[in-house]
């Protein structure tokens, strides 16, 4: 999850500043839709999980996240702010759905006595995953920049190919999630 998920918030401000010529402040504000949509979408995730179940929700949200990451590869200096914001909101909703689902599934079977330790371990794994995802994205971007160049369109293409490459990790996640049983997490759902 973190290989693809952590790459996007790392790559976007770099792309906005280095390739699009935005200021650091503008780049920061452009990331706000990710956080906003993550919070807003949480309201609907319980309903989605109750209807679709954990396996289907996780696979669907991973495919949608891959799609949102691919769509970021289409961004360029002529992209409208509205298009950029819509892409980021789409990504924020996907990330919210994935992380809410996976976190609930991860600690859902722990007893109350184990839940504190489980949450701590989950937090540590997430932090390591964030660092790993950023490192991998950085290496991929560096390789593309060395191969394609650092100026103008070449730099933009390097970012685009990096987004495409990181979307492959989301597709790999779908393969991993396919090993979940359809009934995994059923005890956490409110069935209709």
Functional labels for PLM-detected ranges:
Residues 1-146, 155-185:
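12-transmembrane solute porter fold
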Residues 149-151, 183-192:
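Short, Lys/Arg-enriched, Gly/Pro-containing loop segments at transmembrane-helix junctions
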């Amino acid at each position: 999850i973190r290989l693809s998920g952590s790459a996007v918030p790392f790559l976007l401000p770099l792309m906005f500043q280095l390739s699009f010529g935005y200021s650091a402040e503008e780049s920061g504000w452009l990331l706000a839709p990710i956080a906003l949509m993550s919070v807003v979408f949480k309201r609907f995730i319980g309903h989605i999980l109750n209807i679709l179940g954990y396996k289907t929700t996780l696979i669907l949200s991973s495919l949608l996240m891959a799609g949102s990451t691919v769509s970021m590869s289409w961004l360029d200096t002529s992209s409208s702010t509205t298009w950029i914001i819509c892409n980021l909101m789409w990504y924020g909703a996907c990330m919210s759905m994935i992380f809410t689902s996976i976190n609930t599934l991860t600690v859902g079977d722990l007893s109350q006595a184990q839940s504190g330790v489980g949450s701590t371990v989950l937090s540590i794994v997430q932090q390591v995953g964030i660092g790993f995802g950023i490192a991998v994205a950085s290496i991929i971007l560096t390789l593309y920049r060395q191969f394609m160049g650092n100026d103008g369109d070449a730099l933009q293409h390097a970012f685009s190919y990096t987004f495409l490459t990181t979307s492959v990790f989301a597709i790999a996640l779908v393969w991993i999630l396919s090993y979940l049983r359809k009934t995994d997490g059923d005890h956490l759902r409110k069935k209709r």
